[in-house]
Amino acid sequence: MTYTMDYSKLKLFIYMRPLLILLLTTLTAVSLKAQVEPCGPVPTENQLRWQEMEMYAFIHYSLNTYTDQEWGFGNEDPQLFNPSSLDCRQWARVCKQAGMRGIIFTAKHHCGFCMWPSAYTEYSVKNSPWKNGKGDVVRELADACREEGLKFAVYLSPWDRNHPEYGRPAYVEYFRNQLRELLNNYGEIFEVWFDGANGGDGWYGGANETRRIDGKTYYGWAETFRMIRELQPHAVIWNDGGDRGDLRWVGTEAGNVGETNWSLMPSKGDTPWHMLHYGVEDGDMWCPGETNTSIRPGWFYHDTENEHVKSLSKLMDTYYKSVGRNSCLLLNFPIAPNGRIHPNDSLRGIAFKKMIDEVFKVNLAEKAKTQVKGNETVIDFGKPTTFNRFLAEEDIRYGQRVKRFKLEAMVDGKWVALKDQLVEKGNGLTTIGHRRIICFPTVSATKLRFTVLDAKREPLIKKLGVYLAPELTADIPDAGEKKSSNLHLFFSSPTQMMIDWDAEQTISSFRYLPPQDSKDGTVTHYTLWASTDWSNWTKLASGEFSNVVNNPIWQTIKFQPVRAKMLKFDADRIATGNRMAYGDVEVVTGNN
């Protein structure tokens, strides 16, 4: 049986059966629900609301901003927190203009410093010079979000490197008390975000030691979750350990999820990387992936990254590999020391939103004729039409169903297969879910054919779209630094790298890129030495590369400019394995 109609009339669903496609253009949602059986686990109302947000912002801001760190140790002085022009309304305006529909704020990061005047600790803004200790950043941001029509959410680090009781039962009650403050006092919260980094070295009230915990059992997640659902019944929970939350990490902070992305997970057991990145087709609970990344290399502000803001083409690539792969995008905007989003970040974020609008402003399928037969949908443009993007959406209220599909364009009277150009292997035409966007080289065709090849049950396709995205220019190289050339590297031991160059010169920083294909050998703690003669060595710096395992980006060690001809880079601690590894190293010369 064949139906031909104006695509503009196809507003609700294409209900596909293996041998027959029925166009449901007049059924109400109630009557549809009466006729369609769910397929496996389905989303809750909270998860549906979350999925429809599509993009929202992370805001990282704490004492780390003033110590040029990603992870504070827990002994940083609250007197450092004194921004000259903190403006949460500017944050909210920028995020809204960048297309974000909400903001998640780091109310407390691993250092333990609270960005609200918590009644349970002195380590907070109430003991900073900002507003004479009377300020509350969480309050100001929550109010600003509601003024701008944005949703508000909180990040609360379970790990606290400041608290003396961390690792002991007393800390869990402290943690819940602080969570209760945030959930009770700042209006409706759309998401509660618990970081997966838990346990390690820290100040811990002066003990200055390493404490290990079992992240799955220590915090008593079941009881914590019950409290959240009681105090904030509309919130979703993101949790990277212990009991499953409503959302899952996608296994990387690079800003992408798998081209195959099931919103399903097993409710029990460990979650290896492939489960996080691709989901689990036969999972017994609905747990969609949230894709988190930063507009800069790091999560917190560093002035050395002002010229390293993600390019527009990189942001669009991130969009296609997150929102366009059945996920939501959580995009971080770090706050600069003055208390505002840096202009480089705000301008790029706003340009990002404008580009998304430009790509999707005209759905070429709306003026075409659509013919549906069996498991095929043919969109007939009536004349050669240029396009390079395809969009499909399932009605996930009834489960995620499509496993594999095919796209073909009619070019010069012949069907030509299309593939997703953003995947390295295969054609990338697998799952759909809430939204799937396929990118391919620009083609001029008279027709487009969409064929479902495999599905768990009858697919419910609620939207199809065809678009022409403008071409983006190549990325502009980063500027502002001179990197030394002619470096000579060798290893004097499995944990010591020696670097020298042709002539003595002034150096001001050293950059280390972790291995990109494995965590083995990644340096997490280091000591750096300089010399002019191989005999007398001056210690330049020692410290920690925070979060380097999850976010293996360039790590910069800055120091006072010094004359040197060689460096010694010691791996004091390695993530896994017993031999240090690297992707690249750079020595920055001059007095930068």
Identify the meaning behind each predicted range.
Residues 1-35:
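Bacterial Sec-dependent N-terminal signal peptides
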Residues 441-453, 560-572:
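Noncatalytic modules at the cell exterior or secretory-pathway interfaces
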Residues 35-441, 451-460, 467-471, 511, ...:
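Mature catalytic domains of secreted/periplasmic carbohydrate-active enzymes
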Residues 383-389, 445-446, 502-509, 563-566:
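Extended extracellular/luminal ectodomain segments enriched in beta-structured repeat modules
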